[in-house]
Amino acid sequence: MILYCTGPLDQIDNLHATDLQTFMEKHVRNNPKALVVSGAGIGHDELVDMATRNLGHLQQEEQNTLENGIKSSIYQGGDYKVQHTTEDGFTHVAIGFEIGGWLSTDLVPACVLQSLLGGGSSFSAGGPGKGMYSRLYRQVLNRNQWVESAEACMVFHNEVGLIGITGSSIPKKSALMAQLIRDQLLSLANQQVTDEEFDRARKMLTNSVLMQLESRLVLFEDMGRQALAYGYRENSHEMSRKIDAVTKEDLLQLVRRAICKPPSLAAVGDDVSYVPAYEGIRQWFA
């Protein structure tokens, strides 16, 4: 598992073996309530026996419970721009809005919406054609040769989530890139999607879920993540049923609720001066 570290890189030299030992003691050995054991391709009783033999001796420290260490998240929106030389020379822009988290009813409609928007890069790794009928491919990439990439993005946490669109272009086109993102988001809020693209989005999402779960590596990770987030696991049949239950009206209302919140703007590139100011972007959705 790879985790993104937001701390300053110069602090790496200050880490010592004792720091890692302290971390493991606090969050693993003294906090077994936070542990989830999952497995694929192994019998349930055998897995329970292995977990009991190797982890059964761990004792919970009451002050280490998750309830005592986590504060509720409050979404605020805002902007963050980084003037930084990129390998490709493009400026990357993202605009997103708050939606519900893992435990909300926004989860499945948001996944369908991400499938509908789709998108990708002007260069398709592994062969052309993937996602070419998604909205961002048809309405952004295919109509604007200067767009390097345009893709739906989505992040979920327990209490809140974020959904939006990312795009990249040469620096001088950054303002136009942001406007294209705006137009796509407002279009979703002003009119329902067509039956054809809606049905395609649901089928693509269902196929993606089922295909990924064919891998044992993905399967046991999915079980572990669901146990951590929900305390139980939904099988593929339940997931498919929830996807089929999503309506076009669900997507419309999801986007309308989202854009009522302050936007989140992020940009990174060699020259971010062409990216519109945050207040201007906020007025777009007012």
Predicted segments, located by residue:
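Short, charged, low-complexity patches
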Residues: 106-110, 129, 133, 171-178
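Short, charged helix-to-loop "capping" segments that act as catalytic/coupling loops
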Residues: 32, 41-43, 86, 121-132
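M16/MPP (pitrilysin/insulinase) zinc-metallopeptidase core fold and M16-derived inactive scaffolds
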Residues: 118-146
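Charge-rich, well-structured scaffold segments of protease-associated domains
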Residues: 1-74, 83, 89-94, 99-101, ...
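Active/ligand-binding-proximal structured segments within catalytic/core domains
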Residues: 95, 105-118
